[in-house]
Amino acid sequence: MKWENRKQEMQKMNKNILVVLFLLVFAGANAQENLVKLQKSKTDSIKLYLKEALDLMRKRSVNSSKLKWEEIYKNANEAAENAKTIADTYPIIKNTLLKLGDSHSKFFSPKQVEAYLLGYRKTGQQFPVMKSAILEGGYAYVQLPSFASFNFTEWDEYVKTFWHKIAELESKHPKGWMIDLRDNEGGMFAPMYASISPFLNQSNVIGCKDGFGKYIFMNFKNGKFYENNLARYQFKLGGQKVKIGRMPIVILINQGTGSSGEFAAISFVGQKNISFVGTKTTGLTSANQEHKLADGAFLVLTEGNTVDRNKKEYAEVGKGLQPDYPIDNMGLLKSSDDAYLKKAIEVINKKLSTP
């Protein structure tokens, strides 16, 4: 009897072992299947990410029609075959941007974008300094520096600081103005445009022409920055307003004036009380638009060329804006401020003496 019981227990145990072994094999197979699915899903997401970036370039780049896209997709996908993460596609995207040939399209990783969103102070950087002064003889001088922040609180601060400075200078009743755009390498144009708006005599002074021939003009009114009739951003300026008298204005430019710095300069082209003193600008006069990708990276594409109030197109990379009154051999250096300021004063006095 005991032997029979022992035998039954052994048979039951063997069955249990078989069940456990089956479950382990099944679980192992299931885990392997899930791993394969996960790897496939990861591979698919990498491919989709790269495709999204390439699709944006093909659809939005101003030079899209000049490129062999079938070949570009093929080469990019081949380069991404061994990509293990989305970050592995960044060099491929950057390499493709170079093929666009506009010298202005860029890629910003999520980490770089995060720094732009945090702004200057939260990343341990100094907020751009705006120099201003009433020069001997009663001439107002103000500097508009580069501005590379996507922090909207800092956008407001940038404009309010500039407006405070020009309001203070205007209260001194200057004979004329010098707006210094030298070495303004660009950054965010909306706050720059809002800053200089009190000096502009009309709307539709700066815009772009896209690859389909459509014009888009930027404007600033009642604290809002517009693209055509679409309000893109509402500045919080606390009701602050500035009015500048119509008098001679000299815009100081050099080879370090680029991108949004050039757009600011071009905003004044064709305005009668404006003169340009310095050297030619950088020549990055294309219009860019940022696109947020799935992981938070920014793909910034050149989608058009800058146009002035007369719809003159600034399409040639490197040509830049030419000064009315050249200062020879200054390049990027501002060590010869005396030469710039002396010429600016001379131009202002000439304008004042001309009926």
Tell me what each language-model feature is.
Residues 1, 147-149, 306:
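Short regulatory "switch" loops immediately downstream of catalytic or recognition motifs
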Residues 1-36:
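Bacterial Sec-dependent N-terminal signal peptides
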Residues 33-60, 87, 181, 185-355:
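C-terminal "post-core" interaction segments
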Residues 16-17, 71-74, 209-214:
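Short alpha-helical "patches" and their helix-cap loops
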